[in-house]
């Protein structure tokens, strides 16, 4: 992990993310406390997770009026929603995570990974 990613993750944690559960383990979580993931099969900032995949891995969607650090951007999905990207990679939740701090999706299929500080 580069120093830029580490610095950005720290800024993001201070600005947007909660300090419960996943955050305490060095994993980034949304304000609702649910762990955030990236997918190795995505190409750049474009998601390749739709249909059945998106049911298991819901996109972390947002709007342009939300304020985020520089490493966080919005990318259009084919369904018209805007998905958050972190360091150029689309960001997801895992439907199998049931409680704040769960990270049951980490490493699944060798292609899903928790975003870590």
Region annotations inferred by a language model:
Residues 10-19:
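Bacterial N-terminal signal peptides
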